[in-house]
Design a protein with these regions (language model features):
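A short, conserved, highly charged catalytic patch centered on acidic carboxylates
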Residues: 12-128, 135-161
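Single conserved hydrophobic/aromatic residue that forms the stacking wall/gate
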Residues: 1-11
Length: 161
């Protein structure tokens, strides 16, 4: 791994309720960066990005999600403004299947966070919504026929979606 002692020391101590993985952390232009396996480039290492990279690794390595069907920072047009979904899982036909929204570990997951991901879903109309701050993870399956949703006990494996 590409560790800069300054960058890695800060984030090695920030444990999450997610599996540990071999992060590639560096310092570029005086700023901490982490390698994003989806975007295939280094991105600014913020607390939210730390959660994203761990959660994406969890989906790929532990839940069997194909890297090629995941995208980070997906733009959606909503009421004339452009918003960004943190991570989107696509089907093989490239229609959206799942939205994942991340918050930093110190940010409480509130109704406002669910409202945010629900607004994105007004555009994408996915089957699953996930919200995580790295410590707590919530996943719900949408039921459009009955205009409801069900919270799941666990993040589903890819093959069970």
């Amino acid at each position: 791994p590409l560790y800069s002692s300054a960058a890695s020391d800060v984030y090695k101590r920030q444990s999450l309720n997610l599996p540990v993985f071999d992060t590639k952390i560096n310092v570029r232009n005086g700023k901490n960066v982490i390698f994003d396996v989806i975007r295939k480039r280094y991105v600014a290492l913020t607390p939210e990005e730390w959660v994203r990279q761990h959660f994406v690794h969890f989906l790929i390595a532990h839940k069997g999600y194909p890297t090629t069907l995941l995208a980070n920072e997906v733009m959606v047009k909503l009421n004339g403004t452009t918003k960004r979904c943190d991570t989107v899982l696509y089907r093989r036909d490239l229609s959206a299947r799942m939205i994942v929204e991340y918050k930093a570990p110190h940010i409480e997951i509130t109704q406002a966070v669910f409202d945010q991901i629900t607004r994105y879903n007004m555009v994408l109309k996915v089957d699953y919504l996930i919200v995580s701050n790295g410590m707590q993870h919530y996943c719900c399956r949408m039921d459009y026929e009955h205009q409801s949703y069900t919270f799941l006990q666990d993040i589903p494996d890819y093959h069970s979606l």
